[in-house]
Amino acid sequence: MNNDTPIVPKKFLTVFILLASCFALWGLLNNMTDNLVPAFQRIFTMDQSKAGLVQVAFYGAYAVLAIFAAVLAEEFSYRKGVLIGLAIYIIGALLYIPACIAQSFDIYFIAIFIVAGGCSLLETTCNPYVLSIGDESTSVRRLNFAQMFNPVGSLMGIVLAQQLILSHLNPATADERALMDEATRQGIIHGELFWVCAPYVGLCAIAALIWICFFVKREGERDVTRSAFSRVVVALLFSIVPLTVLYFIFPEMNKVHWVLCGVLGPVAYVALMKDYREMLLILARTPRYWMGVIAQFFYVGVQIAAWTWLNVYCQKELGVTPADGAIYYMIGLVLFLVCRWTATFLMKYFNPALMMAVFSVGAICCCAGVMYLPSDVLFTVEIGDHTLPFAANILCLVAMSGFMSLMFPTIYGIALGGLDPKALKLGASGLIMAILGGAIITPWMADIIGNASSSWCCLVPGFLNTWDPDLKLTQTSLRASFIVPAICFAVVLVYALAFSKRKQ
């Protein structure tokens, strides 16, 4: 590896900055959307399963539209793919306005799906776009560098959600709201939905500015032919028609199954088109690629699952409030950001795959610490008005975020490294479809947490088996559930070791 090769050549610096802003944009949106689940539960007085449709819409859009995004980039260009992704992002965010006026969760569901669809197009095109603007020997470092802006956006998303959405929720419970007169209740709901809507509409201005910058940054692209346009339209129909039909014909269908069935549409398109079928065969014959898709599926799943249950774990083990638990999550995100910056620098001197193997071992050790180390308080930290206790197991839980930091972009870069250029864009879509792991791994972990008699619970000493009526879980099952992240990190470790001796 030539250490003197620039990560980003000067001629691509402007494009790289615009792409990095897109990374921050979808990171911001991801973490704002996570907070819509508790918000909608309170506003619409719905149960957790229906509020959880927010996540189904979000990850479903990623899985279903990733192949369409690849076709878009293949037939048009990366730049046009980014432009269309940003446009869809803006349209979805603007739909929050009629959703707020109509006070309709169904319109919000559609808006979230469209916004996430825009993010899916952005991720599918921006990641390989970053890989392509420079020397291949620095591609993994360049992608890690761009991905550093993603957790910056994530932190901003958490702050915006806390300050603009959650802080404006009325504290009245569902029972208290039921006793209110209609005018009072509608006034409260209208005010709450206004603050749900406001930050998303504000993001439209930022997305529009980025869109304008990309629009004026032309780079001698080919003209779009009628044939290419037709192929893109057909790919879009294959992506959305099966999903729409399933949604209206089988409204009671398990939403995870709904998404999995919806993915069959775009997959069928790829199988039916001869040139895309050839690309698919290239990908199937490239172990570093399809193994990378599997590793990415488990990595995204473990990231979302671990962060989903971090707050609950802190509440149970330390007796802290949900607000304090959110601070532990923010500390983990800051560590995630710092470690990603550090790892990107170290990749100048060390093999990225070998570094990922070391980080995977560290993450597995953290899982063991979360499962077995005591929760006796070692020290406390004052953050504003909050006093946060830290125990050995909590330190491991927070440190896990640091070890996760380099995995997504490194898996992505290794999987696409050296891939036949003809299959690169379709290959990128497979790695984005792997984000569906977030909708599969998280429920798996939840099943263990909610089942005190699960066979997994035998992994944790029985003396920790205490029932918490408020959180509706046992300490044993909560600790035992972290065997799932350990398994996921083990998959990433196997992938890293398989390619650690090959030239990156």
PLM regions and their residue ranges:
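Cytosolic juxtamembrane N-terminal segment immediately preceding the first transmembrane helix
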Residues: 1-26, 42, 276, 280-281
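Conserved MFS/SLC helix-loop-helix module at the cytosolic interface between two early adjacent transmembrane helices
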Residues: 64-106
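C-terminal ends and interior cores of transmembrane alpha-helices
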Residues: 87-102, 362-386
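Extracytoplasmic
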Residues: 14-46, 122, 126-127, 306-314
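A late C-terminal transmembrane helix in Major Facilitator Superfamily
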Residues: 154, 416-458
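Central cavity-lining transmembrane alpha-helices of secondary-active solute carriers
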Residues: 53-73, 330-343
